[in-house]
UniProtKB/Swiss-Prot annotation:
Role, per record: Modulates RecA activity.
Keyword Transcription regulation recorded: no
GO annotation, biological process: regulation of DNA repair
Family matches, as HAMAP family: RecX
Cellular component GO terms held in the UniProt record: cytoplasm
Protein's cellular compartments: Cytoplasm
Keywords from the named record: Cytoplasm
Protein's name in the database: Regulatory protein RecX
Organism: Pseudomonas aeruginosa (strain LESB58)
Family, per entry: Belongs to the RecX family.
Pfam families noted in UniProt: RecX_HTH1, RecX_HTH2, RecX_HTH3
Entry-linked InterPro entries: RecX_HTH_1st, RecX_HTH_2nd, RecX_HTH_3rd, Regulatory_RecX, WH-like_DNA-bd_sf
Keyword hit for Cytoplasm: yes
Gene encoding the protein: recX
Amino acid sequence: MATVLDTPVAVRRAAMDLLARREHGRAELSRKLRQRGASAELIDPALDRLAEEGLLDESRYLESFIASRARSGHGPLRIREELAQRGLPRADIERALGACEVDWSAQLREVWRRKFARLPQDAREKAQQGRFLAYRGYSMESISRLLNGRSDD
């Protein structure tokens, strides 16, 4: 039986339940609460209060999201796009990506090593490896450097 989110207490409880599972951005949390039937008049004050109490923190969400995606082998371009699709401001995304302590070059090499482990032998293999790494979110410049056997760290 679905819970009715028609009171401030019910909306707050639902928001806290979602935040207990993992960090959420404000836009994502608002969308999930609307999907569960809460009205904007109840959602906004509840989220404002959670933010004041430090339970809803965009910077903590960004840090958590970036770390999670980086551990999964995704590069900065893909992470940037996913965060933008989730409604986060570009300036905040850029700040968080700049502050993260991920060595994107080392991560690119590790993702490539796990998947391919050897330099491409012909143009077809090079294109295949390049497409895979580009899909994962790495820059064409970094990919080209790696696949051409140069490590300009």
